[in-house]
Each structure stands twice: as C-alpha cells, then as structure tokens.
Amino acid sequence: MSNQKALVIFSGGQDSTTCLIQAIQTYGRENVQAITFRYGQRHAVELERAEWIAQDLGVSQTVLDLSLMRQITHNALMDETAAIETADNGVPNTFVDGRNALFLLYAAIFAKGQGIRHIIAGVCETDFSGYPDCRGVFVKSMNVTLNLAMDYDFQIHTPLMYLTKAQTWALADEMGVLDYIREQTHTCYKGIVGGCRECPSCILRERGLAECLESKKAV
C-alpha cells in the first residue's frame, strides 16, 4: 500500500500506538499522519506521550483543540476531582458522550483535505470498557455517514476491534515493539506515569499483558 496514505487517530495509549506502528509498517512512514485531540482530558501526560511518540516514530502529528466539550458534557475522564465509577447501566463515568463520533468527524474533514482515504482508529469492542462508541456497528455507521456527508470514499479501519487485550499485546510482539508499547505508552485514567494498576484501564492493560506473556511461555 505504498501509494496510499493513512491517518491514525492517536492518543499515545497502547491501542493507538499499536495501530500507528502497524500503519507505518503497512503504508510506509512517509504516507502516515497522526491526529490527536485535546478535548479537556484530565491529565496532560496523555498529550505529552502522544507528541513524544509521534516525534520518535518520525510521523507528522496534528493536534486539534476540542476542549469546547467541557462546556457541554461532564464525566470523570475530563474532571480530575471525580471518582471513577461504573453506572447502573454498566457504562463507566469515564465515557465521554460523542467523543469518538467527533474524533472520526474531524479526522475525516482533515483527511479529505490531505487527500487521505484511510482512517485508522484503535477502538475495540472485545475488551471494551462499556463504551458504546467503541463498537463495530457504530464505526461502520459512521463510515457510511461520513462518506455520504462528504461524498468521499473513506475507509475506516479498526484493526483491534475484535482482539482481546492479550491479542493486542501479541500483535505488538509480532511487530517487534512489545517492549516499546509497554515502556512508552500511557493508558492510566489517573495520569500516573507507568500506570496506577488500579483504574479500569490499567487493570485491563496489565491483565492482557500477563495473559500474553503467559501464552509466550507456553509455546
């Protein structure tokens, strides 16, 4: 796919970094761009990690300001004083209403202006934390909507959609970057460098890594 370009929605976390590295290997570094969103997330370390990784991998990164979301929605991912909890309906209060819809919309607007058709997102429904906008049906719906809205042939790729977290770690291992993902990416909801090992995101990450490493030992 050396003649095609790709845009990766990039947060600096495990999943999006795995997708970014896979895109570089698939499309070629010169054909890959990253887009990152500042939406009022509670910790600056996420943005700092994303910037560092993009520079380290030699990928052009664009950061868009969507902090207006603070004016219209409230959740624990954007309020550092809020405790992280799961509601009665099973959806954690870290869920940001409309976030992935906005990310895909703005990514598509940017991509079309750059002549890019391939948009890559690291969302996953297998181990997803109860977020409705991480489901395959949502992404497929957005793909159709964006194509109709802009009269453009976008192809939204979600390479991790049906992988468990252990399988995502295994993919990183296959690409030769497991240690890089482990040491350089940031996933913690509490903004603790290296992870707090207590929040849902850290627990999912560590459990998946343990399963992956155990599987390697068994081979």
Curated annotation (Swiss-Prot):
Pathway: Purine metabolism; 7-cyano-7-deazaguanine biosynthesis. It catalyses: 7-carboxy-7-deazaguanine + NH4(+) + ATP = 7-cyano-7-deazaguanine + ADP + phosphate + H2O + H(+). CDD domains: QueC-like. The keyword Cytoplasm does not apply. PANTHER family: 7-CYANO-7-DEAZAGUANINE SYNTHASE. Belongs to the QueC family. This is 7-cyano-7-deazaguanine synthase. It comes from Neisseria gonorrhoeae (strain NCCP11945).
